[in-house]
Amino acid sequence: MSLIKKKNKNIRIIPLGGVGEIAKNMYIVEVDDEMFMLDAGLMFPEDEMLGVDIVIPDIQYVIENKEKLKGIFLTHGHEHAIGAVTYVLEQVDAPVYGSKLTIALIKENMKARNVNKKVRYYTVNNESVMRFKGVNVTFFNTTHSIPDSLGICIHTSYGAIVYTGEFKFDQSLHGHYAPDLKKMTEIGEAGVFALISDSTEAEKPGYNTPENVIESHMYDAFTKVKGRLIVSCYASNFIRIQQVLNLAQRLNRKVSFLGRSLESSFNIARKMGYFDISKDLLIPINEVENYPKNEVIIIATGMQGEPVEALSQMAQKKHKIMNIEPGDSVFLTITASANMEVIVGNTLNELVRAGAEIIPNSKKIHASSHGCMEELKMMINIMKPEYFIPVNGEFKMQISHAKLANEAGVQPEKIFLVEKGDVVNYDGEEMILNEKVNSGNVLIDGIGVGDVGNIVLRDRHLLAEDGIFIAVVTLDPKNRRIAAGPEIQSRGFVYVRESEALLNEAEEKVREIVELGLQEKRIEWSEIKQSMRDQISKLLFENTKRRPMIIPVISEI
């Protein structure tokens, strides 16, 4: 197994994302003077991140040490593993390593964002060995909900540093989804120095339901549907999409996709042979009405909450393309996260009101694309690591995974619970966590990268919750008088017609502040504006208990 004879001096493992959160995976491994980036993912914004499109890791540390970076190594083609690659490549030069499908999806992302940069791409597989000055890097096939997923092995003189990526064990899957247990066993027997492993389902007991069992239960449910069938699933779950295609074939139904998020990745994967599908199975969404309702399946796809949002719009007759009709059946394959439960519940009620029948779901028809407790222990037992670092999960999931590692025989002092920016150092004798590097989130709003910070988010929250209050006044500084105004405008604060007295009082307060400022020897515009903010804010809060954003506008003639 690609052992390194030359002794390495120092190893550093640094998570820049993917810890304390599910998504935004990015882990830096440094061996002596060589740096390797494992995954470069994004995260979709939380509800309170108003106006933010995506979130990526802060790579300032990588930029400061870019001469060391030997490459970006990717485990699979999901956005939380590859979504930040284009942004990273805009700031540093590095080759990109990934499976055939992963590289194809990266190239598509580069094209979509108009990043016209020459990049060296290396397509790797289960047999690839990439040789560097102080280490070798190899790969092993894993099972995830997207084909050609890989684990990554960095071979050092102390043993292998293994990053599992996101994985599960499912013996019912074959071909592009099959794990290479033989290769994993060989890696474990050769000696694993550190295991960096997926913690997403570390709190879920047992094993995942095998995918062939899920498909069988889906078939039983689908055969009972007499009318149009709408299946809601994530665009990233290629296994589930293939299962629906399989069942449509068996039930003699045509399939149409509703959701832009899938089109690009599906078409790429289909052209590359990752989907088993007959030529005449798919029909455009605008041709669905040409077929009897009992001869079609609509797959409503998207990222994050998009599939549920689409169903909600369809139920309320607000969707641009199609709406729910009495007699439709809806089947949800997505699992509602804690923050989505209320939204999903409301959507189900809307669907029923619109006349749809909800196909009852059971745990038998749900499987995560991440390993449950017994699968995680299986990976630990196969690899037999000296050190263990649980990643890709909320902190409580990392803790649960750490307990599993201890149960599997890893000594407690050799298990590291890390946060973003933590540096796990090994100097040849012991591994310690004794350092921190710059880390955090970079918020992307439209085409702006990193120009939305906490202050901007605070202002957006203020606008969303309490609105905006604008005071406009025109001055004649030469004659020291108010030439026009004050004029008060507000949006999202109070209903003007019902608050005329308050607005008139605010107007008089502005006039008073400005006239007082004009009496000073030297007129200080900044002081007048600040006084307007402070006193108007106090007045409005006393009367409404709300604090709108106050914008004083002073112009001169």
Curated annotation (Swiss-Prot):
Record's subcellular location: Cytoplasm
E.C. designation(s): 3.1.-.-
Family annotation (Pfam families): Lactamase_B (PF00753), RMMBL (PF07521), RNase_J_b_CASP (PF22505), RNase_J_C (PF17770)
Principal localisation: cytoplasm
Catalytic EC class: hydrolase
Residues reported to bind Zn(2+): H76, H78, H144, E166
Cofactor binding notes: Binds up to 2 Zn(2+) ions per subunit. It is not clear if Zn(2+) or Mg(2+) is physiologically important.
Example of a GO MF term: RNA binding
Function statement: An RNase that has 5'-3' exonuclease and possibly endoonuclease activity. Involved in maturation of rRNA and in some organisms also mRNA maturation and/or decay.
Oligomeric and partner information: Homodimer, may be a subunit of the RNA degradosome.
Protein name: Ribonuclease J 2
Source organism: Staphylococcus saprophyticus subsp. saprophyticus (strain ATCC 15305 / DSM 20229 / NCIMB 8711 / NCTC 7292 / S-41)
